[in-house]
Amino acid sequence: VNVDFRTALEQPEQGFVVDRSADSTVAMVAFGGIAGGLQIPPFEFFALAGSIPVTKVFVRDLDQAWYQRGIRGLGGSISTAADSLRSVLDDAGAARVVGFGNSAGGFGAILFGHALELDEVHAFAPQTFIDRRRRLWYRDRRWGRPIRALRRSPPDGAVDDLRPLCLAAGGPTIHVHVNASHRLDRAHADRIEGGARVTVHRHASGGHALVAHLRDTNALGAIIRGALDGPGDLDDVRERRS
């Protein structure tokens, strides 16, 4: 990973960071989770692209609002942030763009995957809804404080359920990765599995910290590199160990 890019990644107040040092028409955009991370250090995540030349973009949801308030430095709403991020990608000459995200960042990757018309999205243990009714129905009591803050001051244009986007025609190819035995993560994934372009990959282990587990089993790098190389069958990069 470019040294300047790594240094910028380590600045937690940065809403977005871009590395255009590669001469490439492929870009990867990683969306940080509620704590701004990816379960593993961001520089380590990007390094898993290996020798593939790729423009790298990392965004953080500094408002801890499932990207409902946009991305600081790019725009204060979903639509304005998407427009700015599209300009960044266009300026980099990106013809193929793959989004990645973990947990709340997975929500962001799917959300912006549709807004930006990305080619492919890989969401690890993502939330697919954050509305009160569904959280009560599924008994999802996680992240109570940021959820309450979002409800107290809901932004215009909020998207609290990704299912309609995922079931609509068009949109990116979406790969959702979850631990098959994690009740809540599985429930979030099951709700969008009916989308024609959605594939759910149920891994044997990892819990909600699935990204770290996939890294440790050498599956994460294969997933990332396979996505950047182009569409294909992910069966050969699923984890082999529990």
Residue ranges, per PLM feature:
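Short, surface-exposed "cap/lid" segments of acyl-processing enzymes
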Residues: 2-54, 58-65
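Short, surface-exposed basic-aromatic patches at helix termini and helix-loop junctions that form
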Residues: 50, 112-120, 191-195
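Glycine-rich "HGGG/HGxG" loop immediately N-terminal to the catalytic nucleophile
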Residues: 64-72
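Alpha/beta-hydrolase active-site loop
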Residues: 71-91
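Alpha/beta-hydrolase fold nucleophile elbow
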Residues: 93-103
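Glycine-rich nucleophile elbow surrounding the catalytic serine of serine-hydrolase chemistry
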Residues: 101-115
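Active-site nucleophile loop of the alpha/beta-hydrolase fold
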Residues: 123-134, 181
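The feature captures the conserved acid-bearing segment of alpha/beta-hydrolase catalytic domains
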Residues: 134, 138-202, 208-212, 221-238
